[in-house]
Regions:
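A short, flexible beta-alpha/helix-coil linker loop
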Residues: 102-104, 155, 298-302
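Short, charged/polar, Gly/Pro-enriched secondary-structure boundary elements
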Residues: 46-53, 154-157, 371-372
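C-terminal edge-of-domain segments
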Residues: 136-152, 363
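Short beta-strand/turn micro-motifs composed of small residues
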Residues: 12, 251, 333
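SAM-dependent Rossmann-like transferase core, predominantly class I methyltransferases
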Residues: 147-183
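C-terminal catalytic and target-recognition region of SAM-dependent MTase-like enzymes
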Residues: 279-282, 286-372
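Conserved S-adenosyl-L-methionine
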Residues: 170-285, 302, 307-310
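Non-catalytic nucleic-acid substrate-recognition regions in nucleic-acid-modifying enzymes
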Residues: 1-132
Length: 372
């Protein structure tokens, strides 16, 4: 590790770390290490900027700042005061501290946060503010304290374009990783027949155009002394790719379609996105060329009564089986019983992953011929 380099920990939805690793390696990051809940890399501030700006599947980018053993609060106080906080944070810039304690002699997370906060305040003449974008995270596990800086600010699923959401939204980061699971690379048509606010369709369109995920938002690292605006501008210059494909969504709810159109316009992908009002039974392939259907139907835990959803899933399965021959199909659901109700023969079922507090899986198949 060179003097200007440090450890960077990039988190994602647990269960999809392998897809995040692939994306990070495609970005050209080196010294990658797969871990539970994310990927570790070694790099400098340019890598922090790039990973925040370009990665579609990442949840947060954390900068590892210090690591040391502690067994009591006075020791934590002493070690925290010795750290070079001025290299990480600005003088008199408000900040906040969060601490998690696991299997350690120090077990009071609030008291630990207070010690670290005082060290920063004493060094930088800065005040702690719960509303600050600058978050210092401490993890004390088995008496090892690791201090990191959240360089992202708001979660990276917040792309900066969405003004309207539906009843059961899927996070943009999860949509991007599931698109990768479907082997989408920007050269296939994508259709979501229950598109809600258009997340899956818009993610697919952005990928096809090569648009960076974070191009419409700000990040916490912009408030650090290490940030160089001109260097960042050079690092994030990108020309959109030319793409002749269109990406499609439909929904029976006219309000959802209007939201999708608004969101696509704000994301600047409205020219290659098409949305229309349609029931599942009335759904037809948007193109003659087969592509990918990726759909996040309602599940009983979030929208509606589970019993009423069986008919919906049955209709979805029949429609896909009869009309979407040669299409790749991915269905996201929390309920194996509802997946079974489609009548489709699934070739692969993903790990269980979290979607807004609900455990879901991706059920994949290819419609080679009518299956029902």
């Amino acid at each position: 590790m060179r003097p200007e380099e440090f450890e960077i920990y990039i988190t994602c939805v647990p269960g999809l770390e392998d897809e995040l690793l692939n994306e990070i390696q495609e970005l050209g990051c080196k010294n990658t290490k797969l871990t539970s809940g994310g990927v570790e890399i070694v790099g400098g501030w340019h890598d922090v900027w790039r990973t925040n700006y370009y990665l579609r599947g990442a949840t947060k980018v954390l900068v590892r700042f210090a690591s040391f053993r502690v067994v009591h609060l006075s020791q934590l106080d002493k070690r925290s005061h010795k750290l070079d906080w001025e290299k990480l944070l600005k003088f008199r810039k408000p900040f906040k501290v969060e601490t998690v304690c696991r299997k350690s002699k120090i077990y009071h997370s609030k008291a630990a946060s207070q010690r670290i906060s005082k060290a920063i305040s004493d060094k930088l003449d800065a005040k702690e503010d719960p509303n600050s974008m600058i978050l210092v995270k401490a993890r004390i596990a088995s008496d090892l304290c690791t201090i990191s800086l959240d360089s992202s600010g708001e979660g990276l699923h917040k792309r900066g374009y969405k003004t309207a959401t539906g009843k059961a939204p899927i996070r943009e980061t999860l949509a991007a990783l599931f698109l990768r699971k479907m082997k989408f690379n920007g050269s296939q048509v994508v259709y979501d027949p229950m598109c809600g606010s258009g997340t899956i369709v818009i993610e697919a369109a952005e990928i096809a155009l090569g648009l960076p995920a974070g191009r419409q938002r700000n990040f916490a690292f912009m408030e650090l002394p290490s940030f160089k605006k001109n260097e960042y501008k050079e690092l994030t210059k990108v020309e959109p790719k030319k793409n002749k494909l269109k990406f499609y969504g439909s929904d029976r709810d006219t309000g959802a379609i209007l939201n999708s159109i608004k969101n696509a316009k704000k994301a600047n992908v409205e020219t290659i996105c098409r949305f229309e009002t349609s029931s599942i039974s009335g759904t037809t392939p948007p193109t003659q060329e087969p592509g990918i259907v990726l759909v996040n139907p309602p599940y009983g835990k979030r929208v509606g009564n589970r019993k009423n959803l069986f008919a919906l899933y049955r209709t979805l399965g029949q429609t896909l089986s009869e009309k979407f021959v040669d299409w790749q199909v991915g269905i996201i659901t929390s309920d194996p019983g509802l997946a079974k109700a489609t009548g489709l023969k699934f070739l692969d079922i993903s790990n269980t992953v979290d979607n807004g507090g609900i455990k879901v899986q991706l059920y994949k198949t290819k419609i080679n011929h009518p299956q029902i």
